[in-house]
Structure formats: C-alpha cells, structure tokens
C-alpha cells in the first residue's frame, strides 16, 4: 500500500515520520477562499471534504491518501493562516493569556476505506512575552500555521494546560489515523 500525504505541511509530515509511517508528500490544491462560512468547525470540515474530493482524483493503484485541514478558534472566532504581519499580530493578541482551540479535520481514502475525523485540541495559554512575540513575528514562521499557532516552538513555553491529543493540535489526528491504517490492512488481507 502506497501512502500519500496530500498536504505541504511540514508539521504533518513530521508527525507521520515520528510514527514510522512511510509516505510520499504531494500538494493538493483546494480553494479554501471559496468557503464562505465563518464557523470554525464547519469551515475545517468543508475544507477537508474539498481536499478529500481532490484526493479521489489521485486514487488508483492501491494508493491510500491522507488529507487534513486545521483552523484555530479563540472565543469561537476563527483564525486561519494570517495574510500579513498585522493580521498575525491581531491573532496573537487575541490568543494572549486565553484558551485556544485547534480544530483539525483529518481524512483518509483508499480503495477499501474512507475515514473522516473532526477533533479539537485545547490549550490554555499564559501571557506572551512581548519581546518574544516580536521576534516570532519577525521570523515569519507564523506564515505556515493556522492562527499563527506553533505548539512545537513559539507557543510551547506559554502552555498552562492542554488536552491530551497533541497531534490534533499539530494538524493531524495520528492516533485515529493509525487505527484506520490497521483496519485498512485487515480489510485488504480478507
């Protein structure tokens, strides 16, 4: 079985590597701007479904394709990827000292199986150090992440408490995916 990660996300690729999952990474283009909803859960679900439909075009020769999408919600206000430094600053200002939710919709499609999961990761944050926030904004690393949230580096020292499903916060429900891959292997051996 050949696994394709339909995402350019380095965080998602790293999650698969950390779990010993071999894959090929391919970008799938889906126009998220076509989605008009401002509800974070609906948005991430529709974006993932759109990517899943694009993935079906690649589905052949015993391939399994994984796609995902994430958004951040602060007080039920959606934060996608910041368009510029000012928007990134506004996102971080809203997160500062508050609870954030990372909503991740993960999906898999194979000749034998289709799976879709919407999960939420929560973290309560301490106040950001203003000079560290400025360095982060200057670095440009925020450009890669929904809501400018990078749990693996910038946000890490500011986490007061978090839910257990860190992989969801990093952009892919790996625990769920591992279970589905095992199920897929059993189904294909029947």
Swiss-Prot record:
Catalytic activity entry: a ribonucleoside 5'-triphosphate + H2O = a ribonucleoside 5'-phosphate + diphosphate + H(+); a 2'-deoxyribonucleoside 5'-triphosphate + H2O = a 2'-deoxyribonucleoside 5'-phosphate + diphosphate + H(+)
A Pfam family this chain is assigned to: Maf
Coiled-coil ranges (or none): none
EC number, UniProt record: 3.6.1.9
Enzyme class: hydrolase
GO (cellular component) term, any one: cytoplasm
Biological process (GO), any one: nucleotide metabolic process
Active site: 69
Main subcellular location: cytoplasm
GO molecular function per UniProt: nucleoside triphosphate diphosphatase activity
Annotated keywords: Cytoplasm, Hydrolase, Nucleotide metabolism
InterPro entries in alphabetical order: ITPase-like_fam (IPR029001), Maf-like (IPR003697)
Record localization: Cytoplasm
Required co-factors: a divalent metal cation
Family: Belongs to the Maf family.
Function: Nucleoside triphosphate pyrophosphatase. May have a dual role in cell division arrest and in preventing the incorporation of modified nucleotides into cellular nucleic acids.
Protein name as annotated: Nucleoside triphosphate pyrophosphatase
Organism of origin: Helicobacter pylori (strain Shi470)
């Amino acid at each position: 079985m050949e696994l394709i990660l339909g995402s350019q996300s380095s965080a998602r690729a790293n999650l698969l590597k950390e779990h010993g999952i071999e894959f090929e990474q391919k970008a799938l283009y889906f126009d998220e701007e076509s989605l008009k909803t401002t509800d974070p859960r609906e948005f991430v679900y529709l974006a993932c479904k759109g990517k899943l439909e694009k993935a079906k075009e690649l589905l052949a020769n015993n391939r399994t394709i994984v796609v995902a999408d994430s958004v951040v919600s602060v007080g039920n206000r959606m934060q996608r990827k910041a368009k510029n430094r000012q928007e990134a600053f506004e996102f971080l200002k809203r997160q500062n000292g508050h609870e954030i939710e990372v909503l991740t919709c993960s999906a898999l499609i194979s000749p034998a199986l289709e799976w879709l999961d919407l999960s939420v990761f929560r973290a309560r944050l301490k106040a950001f150090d203003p000079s560290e926030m400025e360095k982060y904004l200057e670095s440009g690393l925020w450009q890669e992440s929904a809501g400018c949230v990078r749990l693996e580096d910038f946000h890490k020292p500011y986490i007061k408490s978090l839910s257990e499903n860190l992989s969801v916060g990093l952009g892919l429900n790996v625990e769920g995916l591992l279970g589905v891959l095992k199920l897929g292997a059993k189904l294909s051996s029947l």
